[in-house]
Amino acid sequence: MKKLTKKANEMTLRELASYIDYSVLKPEFTEEQIVELTKDGVKLGCATICINPGYMDLCEPYVKGSDTMLCPVCDFPFGTSSTESKVKQIEIVAKYDTVKEVDIVANFGWIRGGQYDKVTEDLKKCVEAAHKYGREIKVIFETDALNEEQIRKTCHCCIEAGADFVKTSTGFLTGFEAHGATPEVIKIMMEEVGDKCKVKGSGCIRTREHFLQLIDMG
């Protein structure tokens, strides 16, 4: 988490944009749309452009030389591939110089089933693959599918695995009521991880007030 030197409502648009991972993940996007959205994110000064891994070569030229980097997602949005498959995908995208972070999805079926050892072991191998190339890993939980105890326990899985961030939502979950990055969920995650890793809010951040509130939370 960034060390706050001022309140969010005192920040410039550029400073606020530096907290944003600009999502360009919808499967129906054409390559033309992906390029235009990538350009938009760079122009705004977003921290990263979050893209599907098949578009690395397409998007890389548009972030090179800018303050914006790429954040490819792996095994997204379900997190149910084999560990070997996840690791291979991470190794492919992590080789790009323009990659700052890689987003992966924890197997929330395992989480809901109480199989936390499997969750930790899976994440640990993914983290090792990313760190080998100097890339950070953000682990998405799908907090809307979990209760408080499951969220807290998964935070500990991520810490044990060496993850750099814990993250709330993919934005693609179905079958559950969408709440995303509520202040309540963010507070729970921050309590559990302490200074051992960072927390990233994603999903259902629809208003300026909500966005600024999350920044002020740290």
For each of these PLM feature ranges, what is it?
Residues 16-24, 49-51, 68-75, 100-104, ...:
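Hydrophobic faces of well-ordered beta-strands that scaffold small-molecule active sites
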Residues 43-101:
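Active-site cofactor/substrate anionic-group-binding motifs, chiefly glycine-
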Residues 106-113, 149-187:
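Glycine/Thr-rich beta-alpha phosphate-binding loop at enzyme active sites
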Residues 9-27, 36-41:
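Generic N-terminal amphipathic, Lys/Arg-enriched alpha-helix
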Residues 46, 98-99, 134, 162-163, ...:
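A structural motif
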Residues 89, 94-142:
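Hydrophobic, well-structured mid-protein blocks that either form specific transmembrane helices
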Residues 24, 53-55, 74-78, 106-110, ...:
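Active-site-proximal loop/turn and secondary-structure-junction residues that shape catalytic pockets
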Residues 60, 81-96, 146-157, 184-195, ...:
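Catalytic cores of alpha/beta
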